[in-house]
């Protein structure tokens, strides 16, 4: 019951309500909230049930713009979601429940926020818990969380643990864990993928060289086969030339061959006598006469 609690933790809710719906200061759809520093001036006073004395004035100033932002002393949580940016302080967990919207805080306790009631109570060393419909953003000291659709878990040394808190984000589509300094599992995965790709390229290169060597050996085998075939053909031609009978000027036995012989004799005999490459070199001067006579004989 908010009435039973003291005035020790004050908060100015800057959320606007339109059509009976309240927008939470922690997260506003299409709104940007810049909250002032929460000065911890001691222990909270007026708290029911064993609360220590102290003043925790919390001032909140915010303008409803495209992104909501809450800055607290000691750390930042930036979410690039449509719902806004949340920057959370050192040593605490922040979880928002849009449905219930309750934020209650006590020293060493839990804080729940209710958008309908518009109450925000923050305590030193406390926790803020809630369930968002689309996701949870929890941030620790020195970690930045940027979310578009998936879950980002950020913290020192690639874990979601801050100095006194944890950073956890959960959404249905996936998880991304990032460490301080911009290095995380995604970077390691990319490096592993690059290394594997280079190894595959090297293997393919080795395979390609082996394939090239195999192709060269096949070409050499084909050339050897062609050379063997050519040698065999030459040997066969030589054998045929040796087995051939020389041209004979003897009278043929068949009448057909005899007729051809008689027809060619006036041409062949003078040419045989007068051709320059024949045995009788002295008759080469008559070559012109015999050549013209052979032409006339053929014409007749």
Swiss-Prot record:
Modification after translation: The uncleaved signal sequence is required for efficient membrane targeting and proper membrane integration and topology.
Start and end residues of each stretch annotated as Disordered: 1-251
InterPro entries, alphabetized: K/Na/Ca-exchanger (IPR004481)
Gene Ontology BP terms: intracellular calcium ion homeostasis; long-term synaptic depression; long-term synaptic potentiation; visual perception
GO molecular function: calcium channel activity; calcium, potassium:sodium antiporter activity; symporter activity
Biased composition (Acidic residues): 92-102, 109-119, 126-136, 158-175, 215-244
The entry's keywords: Antiport, Calcium, Calcium transport, Cell membrane, Ion transport, Membrane, Potassium, Potassium transport, Sensory transduction, Sodium, Sodium transport, Symport, Transmembrane, Transmembrane helix, Transport, Vision
Keyword flag Transferase: no
Transmembrane regions: 259-275
Membrane topology recorded in Swiss-Prot or TrEMBL: Multi-pass membrane protein
Main location: membrane
Keyword Ribosomal protein (UniProt): no
Subcellular location: Cell membrane
GO CC annotation, single: plasma membrane
Taxonomic superkingdom: Eukaryota
Catalytic activity: Ca(2+)(out) + K(+)(out) + 4 Na(+)(in) = Ca(2+)(in) + K(+)(in) + 4 Na(+)(out)
Main function: Calcium, potassium:sodium antiporter that transports 1 Ca(2+) and 1 K(+) in exchange for 4 Na(+). Critical component of the visual transduction cascade, controlling the calcium concentration of outer segments during light and darkness. Light causes a rapid lowering of cytosolic free calcium in the outer segment of both retinal rod and cone photoreceptors and the light-induced lowering of calcium is caused by extrusion via this protein which plays a key role in the process of light adaptation.
Similarity comment text for this entry: Belongs to the Ca(2+):cation antiporter (CaCA) (TC 2.A.19) family. SLC24A subfamily.
Name of the protein in question: Sodium/potassium/calcium exchanger 1
Native source organism of the sequence: Bison bison (American bison)
